[in-house]
């Protein structure tokens, strides 16, 4: 239901805080979804952490871990025995004051996803969360799964951005940031997608904003787009001549250049490369 300004003014402090929290959550989620649509990235499911708590999934997750004998109480807090499965220490699920930790949600979310039929759970973490890998795998082990199969963790590295030959200094605290939307606005969605996917996720990445908009072969995005345009032109010319690439006879003797044979080999290998890229979560291979 819509709430007018007067109703907001008449709310108690707690009600007003909850109202603005809900409004802020809805606004930020809508912005994130809009930017991802702009970036041509689609998620089949958007799962809220709030739903995890409201649906009882956290309690069900705790119950499953309790039943497996992997939780215990100490100093008024609830712990998970992650150190028995490779983590450097046990982790707190519920603090002594009753507040749940982030790790509690992570644990419950894993148990909930497995209950919903997801066999492999892929986590994409920032470079500063490398220490989280062990505890995520320990969650899988505590749930009776194989951490090496049921958990995949991809570690993303930092992105440096250059403009006019100088690094753009970023600071979240000062509000000096370059968003994904800014990147798309500067160079276009194709340039942004290609630039971010060109290297492995675990490699540091440098983006030159000036280079992204150059229409020269120095710009790898332009080079790929130019190659695509030339190939499309060849196919249109062949169609104008009545040549059907699917059924026309193939005369291999016309391919006398070594580069031509190499190119055919690369094209023939493309299905294997695409399959390997998907299996290894490494789209830069394509």
Describe the residue ranges of each PLM region:
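Non-catalytic interaction-recognition regions
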Residues: 1-286
């Amino acid at each position: 239901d819509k709430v007018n300004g007067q109703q907001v003014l008449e709310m108690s402090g707690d009600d007003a805080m909850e109202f603005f929290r809900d409004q802020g959550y809805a606004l930020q989620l809508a912005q994130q979804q809009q930017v991802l649509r702009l970036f041509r990235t689609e998620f089949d499911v958007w799962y809220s952490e709030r739903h995890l708590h409201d649906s009882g999934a956290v309690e069900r997750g705790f119950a499953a871990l309790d039943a497996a004998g992997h939780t215990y109480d100490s100093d008024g807090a609830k712990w998970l025995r992650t150190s028995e499965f490779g983590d450097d220490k046990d982790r707190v699920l519920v603090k002594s004051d009753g507040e749940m930790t982030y790790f509690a949600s992570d644990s419950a979310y894993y148990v909930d996803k497995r209950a919903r039929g997801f066999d492999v759970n892929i986590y994409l973490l920032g470079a500063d969360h490398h220490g989280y890998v062990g505890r995520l795998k320990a969650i899988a082990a505590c749930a009776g799964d194989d951490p090496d199969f049921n958990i995949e963790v991809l570690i993303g590295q930092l992105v440096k951005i250059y403009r006019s030959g100088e690094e753009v200094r970023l600071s979240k605290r000062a509000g000096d940031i370059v968003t994904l939307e800014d990147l798309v606005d500067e160079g276009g969605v194709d340039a942004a997608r290609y630039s971010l996917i060109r290297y492995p996720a675990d490699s540091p990445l440098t983006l030159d904003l000036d280079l992204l908009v150059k229409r020269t072969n120095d710009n790898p995005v332009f080079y790929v787009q130019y190659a695509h345009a030339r190939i499309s032109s060849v196919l249109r010319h062949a169609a104008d001549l009545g040549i059907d690439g699917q059924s026309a006879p193939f005369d291999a003797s016309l391919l006398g250049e070594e580069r031509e044979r190499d190119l055919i080999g690369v094209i023939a290998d493309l299905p294997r490369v695409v399959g390997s890229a998907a299996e290894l979560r490494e789209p830069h291979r394509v």
